[in-house]
Amino acid sequence: MNPYIALTRPGNAILTAIAVIAGAFIAAGPEIIEFQTEIAICCVSAMMLVGGGNALNDYNDRESDKENHPNRPIPSGEISAETALNYSHILLGSGLVILWFTLANWLVFLIALIGVLTLIAYENGLKAAGIAGNIAVGFMSGAVFLYAGMAVDNPGPTIWMFGLAFLATISREIIKDIQDLEGDRDRKTLPSRIGIDYSLNIAIMILVIAIGLSYTAINQFEGNALSAYIGGITIANVLMFLGIYNAKNKDFFTSQKNIKQGMGVAMLAFILAAGLI
C-alpha cells in the first residue's frame, strides 16, 4: 500500500464517513436525500481530518512503533517522520478549509475545529494525562454525530447519540486503562491514581448514566419508530450491562468489546427509528 494512504489508515477513514452518513440519517431520516452535497462534503472533510489525525499519531508514536508496529510507514523507512508530520498538517488544514469555503452552516466548521484542537491536544499531552484523555476520546467519538446533524440543519436528534457515544466511550477508555495498568506506568491514568476498584466503579456509574440517557430519547419517536427504537436500544443496553458484568469479573477485554457492540447496536436503533418516522 502507498505509504501516504497507509498513514491515514483508510479503514478508519471509511468508517468515519459511514458514521457521518449514519448521523445525517438519524437527524434527517428519509429527507437525507435533500442534503447530498452537504453530506458528501462532510464525508470528504471528515476522512481528511481522521487521516491527518492518524498520521499525527504515527508521528508521535514513531519510537514505540519501531518495536510495536515496525511495518508502519515511518519505522519501516517508507516515509520520514518530518514528511509524515507535514502530511498530517496538510490533511488537517485542508479538511477544515473545505468546510469553511463550501458550507453555509458555520457550526459544522466549528465542531470540526474543536475536534481538531482536541485531537492535537490529545496527541501532544492529554493521551498521557489519564481521565482528561479519556474525556477527549469520548468527545471525539460523539462529535461526529453532532457534526453530521449540523450538516443537515437538524442536530437535535443526534444530541442523544452524541451523549451515548461520549459517556460509553469514556467508560470504555477507563476500563481499557484498568486492563493496561501494568504497561502504563508512564501515564497518569485514573486507575494508577485512585486504584482499580474506584476506577471501575466510576466507569460503571458513567455507563449506567449512558444507559439511562438512552431511554430519554423515546419522546423523539412514536408508532412503529418508537417500537423499533425501544427494541433496539434495549438490546444495546443488554450488551452494556454484559460489559459491566464482565468488568466486575475482571474480564476487561470482553467488557470493552461488549460496550463497543452496544454502541453499534444503539446507532442502528437510532437509524432504524429515523427511517420509520
Q: Model segments located where?
A:
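Extended hydrophobic alpha-helices typical of membrane-associated regions
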Residues: N2, N219-I277
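Intramembrane alpha-helical segments
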Residues: N2-L7, P73-W160
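C-terminal ends of transmembrane helices
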Residues: N2-P3, E63, L117-G130, D177, ...
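Select subsegments of transmembrane alpha-helices in polytopic membrane proteins
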Residues: T8-L15, S80-I90, A132-V137, D197-L207, ...
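Small-residue-rich segments of transmembrane alpha-helices in multi-pass membrane proteins
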Residues: A17-G23, P75-S76, I135-M150, P191-I196, ...
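Membrane-embedded alpha-helical segments that form the functional core of polytopic membrane enzymes
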Residues: A17-N60, G95-L99, W106-I120, P155-I175
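Structural signal for membrane-spanning alpha-helices in multi-pass inner-membrane proteins
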Residues: V20-A27, G95-L103, L119-E123, V144-V152, ...
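Solvent-exposed interhelical
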Residues: S45-L96, F166-F221
